[in-house]
Amino acid sequence: MNAYEAYMNELATQMRSELTGRDFKSLETADEVSNFMTNVGSDDTTFVVINSTCGCAAGLARPAAVTVVEQNDKKPTNKVTVFAGQDKEATATMRDYIQQVPSSPSYALFKGQELKHFIPREHIEGRDIQDICMDIKDAFDDYC
C-alpha cells in the first residue's frame, strides 16, 4: 500500500466510524452486500448510506442520517453503509440493487429488495441539513 492509500484508509476509517458507531453495518465487499440483500426479509426496511470522503458527506450526509435514525419514531429494520471510493466492489454491487445513476454520498431506502426511496448527492449538497433530515424522515414515515 502506498502512502496515499494508507492516508485515505485512515481518513475513511474515521468517516466510516461516524456511521458504524451508530449501529450502521458496514458492507465492505461485494459478497457482503449480496449476502445481506439476498437474506433481507421481504417486510424488512433497509436504510443504505453510500458514504464518501467529500465535504458534503462530512457536513451534511452523515450527520443527517445519524440524526434521523436516532430521533425519528419510525425506523428502518436495518441500517447499512458502503463507502464509495474505498469499497469499490461493495459500492458497485449496492448500486446494482439501487438501479439509479451512481451518486455519492446518497441514501437509499428498501423494503425487502425493492427500492422505495432514493436521495442522490444533488439533493444533499448545498442544502440545509434540516431539509435533508426532513427528506429522510418523510421516507421513514412512509415506508418504515
Curated annotation (Swiss-Prot):
It holds the Pfam family Disulph_isomer. Belongs to the bacilliredoxin family. One of its GO terms (biological process) is cell redox homeostasis. InterPro entries: BrxB/BrxA. This is Bacilliredoxin SSP1311. The lineage of its organism: Bacteria, Bacillati, Bacillota, Bacilli, Bacillales.
